[in-house]
């Protein structure tokens, strides 16, 4: 019972930081110019600049919005979406001890796991922004280059709160638990050290990165209807692979997807 209460508190703490307001300005599209790309709409002054040189300052600006978001809850705003996500996460956490043993025992996903291994999914996630940037450089297309730069910013901005939360929760991965072990006693037990980047932890870092990148491409190329479906479909496969590989529980993946999407959609692409 105490473990369940801790799970809900952790989920509430994370989601209260990372469910930014939906009442944001519309998504801006950049002008096709040389130098640092700007984000604007016709007839409006530039809203921001994006470049590799500005990446650190942009990430710091994003972090300010992420970590100050709980202040909006104190003023009575955004309680409905935050509460909904907290309850959804708590429900998945309660189901984790029942779903994890199935993926430990089944051999159904052996081939799937070989294809979407740890290293292969990293390569898959890196391929899209690297390709976009390379094509943009060759074609002198600042929009394509900015897409890659925004993807890098989105991943960094979402992974920072994810890493902090992983260090606080210190959750074991399903693979750390013996086949007949207790899949409920997973919180505050990992001894993998601060800022650990490997398997395990709440939330899933792979899923955070996958949905951050997917959201950038899905929104910046949303007029091509196949792009959002492909981007989120591939991100979903990356997240699912973390479960089948026994690297994460389903709740880790769910919160990773929420975190990657919300930080990218409501903060990185909205200012």
Predicted regions and their residues:
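Bacterial N-terminal signal peptides that target proteins for export
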Residues: 1-9, 119-120
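Bacterial N-terminal signal peptides
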Residues: 9-18
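N-terminal targeting leaders of membrane proteins
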Residues: 18-120, 125-139, 174-200, 271
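Divalent metal-coordination and catalytic microenvironments
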Residues: 63, 87, 165, 206, ...
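Interfacial segments of alpha-helical transmembrane regions
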Residues: 81-82, 135-161, 165, 228
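Alpha-helical transmembrane spans of integral membrane proteins, capturing the lipid-embedded, hydrophobic core
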Residues: 82-86, 90, 126-129, 151, ...
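Transmembrane alpha-helix/helix-exit interface in multi-pass inner-membrane proteins
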Residues: 94, 158-179
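Membrane-embedded catalytic cores of phosphoryl/pyrophosphoryl-handling enzymes
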Residues: 179-271
């Amino acid at each position: 019972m105490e473990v369940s209460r801790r799970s809900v508190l952790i989920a509430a703490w994370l989601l209260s930081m990372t469910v930014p307001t939906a009442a944001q300005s519309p998504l801006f599209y950049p002008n096709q110019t040389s130098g640092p790309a700007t984000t604007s709409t016709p007839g409006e002054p530039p809203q921001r600049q994006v470049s590799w040189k500005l990446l650190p300052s942009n990430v710091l600006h994003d972090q300010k919005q992420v970590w100050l978001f709980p202040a909006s809850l104190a003023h009575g705003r955004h309680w409905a979406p935050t509460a909904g996500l907290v309850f959804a996460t708590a429900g998945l956490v309660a189901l984790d001890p029942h779903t994890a043993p199935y993926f430990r025992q089944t051999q159904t996903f052996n081939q799937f796991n070989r294809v979407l291994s740890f290293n292969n999914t990293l390569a898959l996630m890196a391929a899209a922004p690297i390709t976009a940037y390379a094509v943009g450089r060759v074609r002198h297309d600042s929009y394509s280059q900015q897409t890659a730069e925004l993807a890098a910013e989105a991943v960094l901005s979402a992974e920072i709160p994810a890493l902090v939360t992983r260090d606080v929760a210190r959750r074991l991965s399903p693979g750390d638990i013996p086949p007949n072990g207790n899949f409920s006693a997973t919180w505050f037990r990992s001894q993998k050290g601060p800022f650990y980047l490997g398997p395990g932890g709440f939330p899933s870092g792979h899923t955070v990165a996958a949905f951050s990148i997917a959201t950038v491409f899905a929104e910046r190329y949303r007029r091509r209807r196949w792009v959002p479906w492909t981007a989120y479909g591939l991100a979903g496969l990356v997240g699912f692979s973390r479960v089948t590989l026994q690297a994460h529980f389903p709740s880790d993946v769910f919160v990773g997807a929420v975190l990657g999407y919300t930080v990218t959609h409501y903060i990185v692409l909205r200012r």
